[in-house]
Curated annotation (Swiss-Prot):
GO terms for molecular function: protein domain specific binding. InterPro entries: L27_C (IPR014775), L27_dom (IPR004172), L27_dom_sf (IPR036892), LIN7 (IPR017365), MAM_complex_regulator (IPR051109), PDZ (IPR001478), PDZ_sf (IPR036034). Coiled coil: none annotated. This is Protein lin-7 homolog B. Transmembrane segments: none annotated. CDD domains: PDZ_Lin-7-like. Residues 93-175 form the PDZ domain. Residues 187-207 are annotated as: Disordered. The gene is Lin7b. Forms a complex with CASK and CASKIN1. Component of the brain-specific heterotrimeric complex (LIN-10-LIN-2-LIN-7 complex) composed of at least APBA1, CASK, and LIN7, which associates with the motor protein KIF17 to transport vesicles along microtubules. Forms a heterotrimeric complex composed of MMP5, LIN7B and PATJ; the N-terminal L27 domain of PALS1 interacts with the L27 domain of PATJ and the C-terminal L27 domain of PALS1 interacts with the L27 domain of LIN7B. Forms a heterotrimeric complex with DLG1 and CASK via their L27 domains.
Length: 207
């Protein structure tokens, strides 16, 4: 039986670190420029994004061992998530309640289509729209700690349907890739329509 995982308090720890930096600045013991630079980093959106992804992975990774082993594995997984997003927006964690009305968004893409899985539509007035945080063009990286990168479309659908109470999504915003993918799909649909029209015309001429 797996040991209970003690919840993290990283947000509290960051706040304490900022308070300590403010005290050190008042004391004049260290150069204020360096302390202010470190304080800006700790209070930045980037640091918040790292903390959110780390906490999400820490809570959901299936790892046995000491707290140190778990922390090390979570750190590696967090670095991997941000490395994979290099050149794109950084990963974000979006948590939505799971209700009878659904989650309020559509996804497209998957391994069978040789593309990542994307949020193709946020339904106006739906759960995702009301809670905010999720955008059309977000690439879906994981669902409740389970990676969907390189997975089939149906795998993501199953994970979203199986979620109970709430669902935690790790996403990153890359709208250009979604636009390219939609343009590719539209070309494929147009080619199929032309082929069907050609077949229909050929049958008519034979008649």
């Amino acid at each position: 039986m797996a040991a209970l995982v003690e919840p993290l308090g990283l947000e509290r720890d960051v706040s304490r670190a900022v308070e300590l930096l403010e005290r050190l600045q008042r004391s004049g013991e260290l150069p204020p420029q360096k302390l202010q630079a470190l304080q800006r980093v700790l209070q930045s959106r980037f640091c918040s994004a790292i903390r959110e992804v780390y906490e999400q992975l820490y809570d959901t990774l299936d790892i046995t061992g000491s707290a140190e082993v778990r922390a090390h594995a979570t750190a590696k997984a967090t670095v991997a998530a941000f490395t994979a997003s290099e050149g794109h927006a950084h990963p974000r964690v979006v948590e939505l309640p799971k209700t009878d009305e659904g989650l309020g968004f559509n996804i497209m893409g998957g391994k069978e289509q040789n593309s990542p899985i994307y949020i193709s539509r946020v339904i106006p007035g739906g759960v995702a729209d009301r809670h905010g945080g999720l955008k059309r063009g977000d690439q879906l990286l994981s669902v409740n700690g389970v990676s969907v990168e390189g997975e089939h479309h149906e795998k993501a659908v199953e994970l979203l349907k199986a979620a109970q109470g709430s669902v935690k999504l790790v996403v990153r915003y890359t709208p250009r890739v979604l636009e390219e993918m939609e343009a590719r799909f539209e070309k494929m649909r147009s080619a199929r329509r032309r082929q069907q029209h050609h077949s229909y015309t050929s049958l008519e001429s034979r008649g």
